[in-house]
Regions:
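Divalent metal-coordination and catalytic microenvironments
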Residues: 10, 25, 30, 52, ...
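C-terminal cap of metal-dependent C-N hydrolases
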Residues: 10, 336-384
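Short, acidic/polar
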Residues: 70-80, 139-150, 200-206
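Metal-cofactor-binding active-site regions of metalloenzymes
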Residues: 84-90, 94-95, 110-138, 161-165
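Active-site core of metal-dependent hydrolases
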Residues: 162-287
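His/Asp/Glu-enriched, well-ordered alpha-helical/loop segment
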Residues: 261-346
Length: 384
């Protein structure tokens, strides 16, 4: 068959599809048409040489904030994503029932990146980094409106978002979690995502009200009541049991939620994140310490998480949670031709966590080319 484009000679890595090794990828009509050791016998309108590069599915970031101009967090989606190999992301509760239409307008008119969104339990959504908690005042909670928004926006809204932490909720008990879970049930049993950093109460008291498929985000924060309790030495048995039961643990780096000592201890004890994400905002994308998803992936690579598992947790795993399994996050024939090409650069790279600690990594992932629906949307300038 004739391809629109063939990506040749790259080191393909897609653990979910069982692909690893030097392969060519043929693209036609915006879809993956063929993956084989060689497609040299097939005509193509364009060929891109990927020799010496890693070729992965387009990255999927399940936790970011992209409601631009609505608060001080939202970043320019396409600018942030293209240069980092991300082709799909999920906005994690920036908007609630009262302003979700505004988020949709921004995405429909200004954004090419594929986006899904969690709807905040608070009607007003996240107001920013310095204006207090969106659920510190109980009347802002809008379970009926949140559920209705999810039901009325099936192409965009995928679940309920709750931020549980100091100053973020109206009371420090499990009641906000119970309300968020009931809201998710009202919306048809969609997942809820819960922010847990610096929780005022122990984590087991919260996760006991979650269901399989729900998401605990910021699982590697180093503050109060995390996955290792107050001693911060050993994983809580309730956390291990919750993950085994199907609760999703997402790392979501962010400004305050990614601690190297917690990561090292958790990985040493066999606790891997189910998904790798950024919690990216305009500030953390431009001033650090997050920068982008490949940087977060590189930090986990430094601590010994195998590259194949990093790719799985940054592509197929979040795609499945977002209801996009088989469409994105995969290089299987028939999937959208979302492809990221990376250089695994060697050197000495100083990387920082959310609490100011640094590591010197020997390897770092750098996006070389990003393709969405078969079209190149980013190429790294030569010599950079």
């Amino acid at each position: 068959m004739q391809f629109d484009l063939v990506l040749t000679g790259g080191d393909v890595i897609d653990p979910a599809a069982g692909l690893r090794g030097m392969m060519d990828i043929g693209i036609a009509g915006g879809k993956i048409a063929a993956v084989a050791p060689s497609l040299a016998g097939n005509p193509a309108r364009k060929t891109i040489d990927a020799k010496g590069r890693l070729v992965m599915p387009g990255l999927v970031d399940i936790h970011a904030h992209v409601f631009v101009n609505a608060h001080d967090m939202g970043g320019r989606t396409d600018q942030i994503c293209g240069c980092s190999g991300v082709t799909t992301l999920c906005d994690a509760g920036s908007a609630g029932s009262s302003n979700f239409a505004g988020l949709r307008h921004v995405l429909d008119t200004e954004v090419r990146t594929r986006v899904r969104a969690f709807v905040n339990l608070s009607a007003i959504g996240i107001t920013g980094t310095s204006r207090g908690g969106e659920l510190s005042h109980f009347p802002y909670a809008d379970p009926e409106g949140c559920a209705r928004t999810i039901v009325e926006n099936p192409d965009l809204a995928i679940g309920v978002k709750l931020r549980f932490g100091p100053g973020l909720v109206w009371e420090y008990s499990a009641e906000p979690v119970k309300l968020a879970r009931r809201t998710a049930d009202m919306a048809g049993g969609v997942p809820m995502m819960m922010h847990i950093t610096d929780s005022p109460i122990p984590l087991p008291a919260l996760i006991e009200h979650m269901k399989p498929g729900d998401i605990v985000t910021h699982c590697y924060h180093g503050r109060a009541h995390g996955i290792m309790g107050q001693e911060k030495q050993f994983l809580l048995k309730e956390v291990v049991e919750a993950q085994r039961a199907g609760i999703i643990f997402d790392c979501a780096h962010g400004r305050n939620h990614f601690n190297f000592r917690m990561i090292e201890r958790a990985l040493d004890q066999g606790f891997l994140p189910d998904t790798i994400s950024t919690d990216l905002t305009v500030t953390t994308a431009t001033q650090g310490p997050v920068w982008d998803l490949p940087t977060t992936m590189s930090k986990l690579l430094h601590f010994g998480l195998p590259l194949e598992e990093i790719v799985r947790r940054s592509t197929a795993a979040p795609a499945r949670i977002m209801g996009l399994e088989g469409t994105v996050g995969s290089l299987r024939p028939g999937a959208n031709a979302d492809i990221s090409v990376f250089e695994l650069r060697e050197g000495a790279f100083e990387l920082r966590d959310s609490d100011g600690d640094t590591i010197v990594a020997k390897r770092r992932l750098l996006a070389h080319l990003t393709m969405k629906d078969g079209r190149v949307c980013y190429e790294r300038p030569e010599g950079t």
